[in-house]
Amino acid sequence: MMSLKIQPAVPKKSDKPSATNRDCQNFKREKNNLPFQLTDKSCNLDISIRQERKKTLIFSFFSGAGFLDLGFELSGFDIAFVNEVHPPFLEAYKYSRSRMDIPKPKYGYFKGSIDECLYAEKAKDLAGWVKKEKQNGIIVGFIGGPPCPDFSIAGKNKGKDGENGKLSQSYVDLICKNQPDFFVFENVKGLYRTAKHREFFNALKRQLSDFGYVCTEKLINAIEYGVPQDRERIILVGFLSQHVDALQKFDWDAHISFPDALEKDWPTTEEVGRVVSQPANIYPELTVQYWFNRNGVDTHPNASKHFQPRAGLEKFQTISEGDDKKKSYKRLHRWRYSPTAAYGNNEVHIHPYLPRRISAAEALAIQSLPKEFELPDNMTLSNMFKTIGNGVPFLAAKGIAMTLKSYLENHYERTKTDGC
C-alpha cells in the first residue's frame, strides 16, 4: 500500500485582487455598518458595533446554521428573527454566532415549522412584530431558502407535492400574509430549469404579483462571487411595488467578481500522490487549496470532523486527483474549484491528496465561510455535513446582500406611516 505524504504547494499570487483583499476593502467601506465586533486577522481590522438603530431588519426562515444570514450580517443588515425546525441546526446557528460575538436577534429564535409561523400562535407574534417595525419606518425583509430535494436532480423529484416542495408554497404564503417590504427566495436550479417545476415557480411569482410584489430573478453561480465551488442556484427577489423604482435598476452583476471563472483552463486530473504545481492562467483564489490555506483547515476547531472510510483506504488511494465525474466518489483537485458541495445521496468528496473524506473544516472553507465560523463539537457528523451542504455559500450570500443594500439605498422610498 502506498503512502500519501504530499504537502500542498503554496499558491502563486494572481494579478487579480484576492478574495481576502476584496473583503478587506469591503470591510473598510462598511466598517460603521456592521452589526457586531469582528477581528479579521487577515485584514487587521477591528470592526465595531454600530450604535444607532438600523433602518432595515431581516426575518430569517429555514435558517439552518445561518450561512445566508451571515452574508446579510456582514453587509450591514440586522437579523431580527430566526426560524429553524431542526434543533441541531438551530443550536449550530446560536453557537457559531456566540463564537463570533454576534448579538442575538431582536425577536429571538424560534424552533418550529414554517407553518407554525403561518397559522399557529407564533403567527400572531410575527405579524405584530412586522407591523410594528413597518409603522416605525423600518424596512422589513424576509429571507429564506426552503428545503429543495423535491426540486433537485439528485433528490426524489416530487416537486410541489413533496413534503419539502410544499414548504416553498408556505414561504410564499407567509410573505403574502405579512407583507414585508422585500424578500429573498433561494432554491435549486431544478425549480427554474425543469419544465414541470418551472410551472410551479411561475405560479408562485403570479401569487406574489397579486399581493403587490414586483420581482426579479437570476440563476446565479456561486463561483462568480468568489466561492471555490461550481454551484448554481435560483434567486428570486421581490419588493412591494409602491416603494420601488423600475427593477431594471437592480444590478445583479454589481458584486460579481469572477464572471469568466468557468472559462479558465482549469486542470483536469492527476495521478494520485504526485506533487502538483499551481497552473498558470487560473484564479488561485477560486481553488480548493487557496481556501484550505486561507481558513487554516488543519488547525480549525472542526479539523478532525470527517467520516472514516468503511472499506479501508484502498479505494481512496486509486481515484485520481480531480476525478469528480463519478456519481458517488469524487476526488477534489487542489488547483481547481469544487463541484457542488452536496454531501448526501451517497456522494463522497475525497481530499485532493490525502486518503480520506474532506473534513467539516474543509467543507466550510469550500462554502467560503470566514475562518472564524465553526460548528459545535458535539454536533453529529451527519448533521454537520447536512447543514454545510444545504447552506448558501457565504460569499454568494454576501454578494446578494450587498446588491440588495445598494438598491434599497438608491431606489427605495419609505414613509414612516405606511405598512399598517
From Swiss-Prot:
Q: Which reaction is recorded as catalysed by this protein? A: a 2'-deoxycytidine in DNA + S-adenosyl-L-methionine = a 5-methyl-2'-deoxycytidine in DNA + S-adenosyl-L-homocysteine + H(+)
Please name the GO terms of the biological process aspect recorded for this protein, alphabetically: DNA restriction-modification system; methylation; negative regulation of gene expression via chromosomal CpG island methylation
Q: Where is the SAM-dependent MTase C5-type domain?
A: 56-411
Q: Where is this region: Disordered?
A: 1-23
- Give its E.C. classification number: 2.1.1.37
- Disulfide-bonded cysteine pairs: these are none
Give the keywords, sorted: DNA-binding, Methyltransferase, Restriction system, S-adenosyl-L-methionine, Transferase
Q: Which domain of life is it from?
A: Bacteria
Q: What PROSITE patterns does the entry give?
A: SAM_MT_C5 (PS51679)
Q: Name one Pfam family in it.
A: DNA_methylase
Similarity annotation: Belongs to the class I-like SAM-binding methyltransferase superfamily. C5-methyltransferase family.
* One function term, GO molecular function aspect: DNA (cytosine-5-)-methyltransferase activity
Q: What is the protein's name according to its record?
A: Type II methyltransferase M.NmeDI
The record's InterPro entries line, in alphabetical order, gives: C5-Methyltransferase (IPR050390), C5_MeTfrase (IPR001525), SAM-dependent_MTases_sf (IPR029063)
Catalytic residues in the record: 148
